[in-house]
Swiss-Prot record:
Main location: cytoplasm
Organism: Caulobacter vibrioides (strain NA1000 / CB15N)
Keyword Kinase: no
Record's function text: Plays a role in the regulation of phosphate uptake.
NCBIfam families named in the record: phoU_full (TIGR02135)
Protein's name in the database: Phosphate-specific transport system accessory protein PhoU homolog
Protein location: Cytoplasm
Key words of the record: Cytoplasm, Phosphate transport, Transport
Taxonomic superkingdom: Bacteria
Amino acid sequence: MTEHTVKSYGEELAHLTAEVTRMGGIAESQVADCIAAIARRDGPLAQAVVAGDERLDTLQSEIERKAFRLIALRQPMAVDLRHAVAALKISMSLERCGDMAKNIGKRALILTEADPMSALTRSIERMGKLVQGRLKDVLDAYTTSDLQRAIGVWSRDEEVDEHYNAIFRELLTYMMGDPRTINACTHLLFVAKNLERIGDHATNIAEIIHFELTGEELTSQRPKLDVLSQ
């Protein structure tokens, strides 16, 4: 392989990483905005989140196309192959995070028409901030190839589950105490579930980073809490 070809190959891999990083920044913004839309009962911001999901879909398709092209034409091996596959898999997780943010945006639009439920909204906001932080940490780990940071995100997955379980119980209490809150509480329950799924995708990305950097799977069982089993 000539020096020019090697340089071009390296640039293609770097460009793929940069595109995933850019997509991650957009996904972070979408998640932050959907949380803010819930907290502030901000209809226009919620609508912007719903409309903005298309950018992530487009970027994911571009990254997928470029990753497949690189694999087909360059036939990378070992660590280079892991880099390309990681970019592809992470872009897919980010696209799903965008879908979750879009779903939350749609719920936020409905909730702006409902009576305010300040205590529950604050609980959702706290969970949202936690999930937002997890997503930021794991994307920073990807950008900087920080293995320990990725493992840290993976090992703290249980915290998001604890928040979800607490909100689940809180919402049940509200609905049993006042049936008039059932409609709004149901939407908030879906919001919390979408946030939990974003947290799961952050954990999945941490696992992808671990394999990308080490060539080994994270073998320990991921910590997980399930309110329905308790």
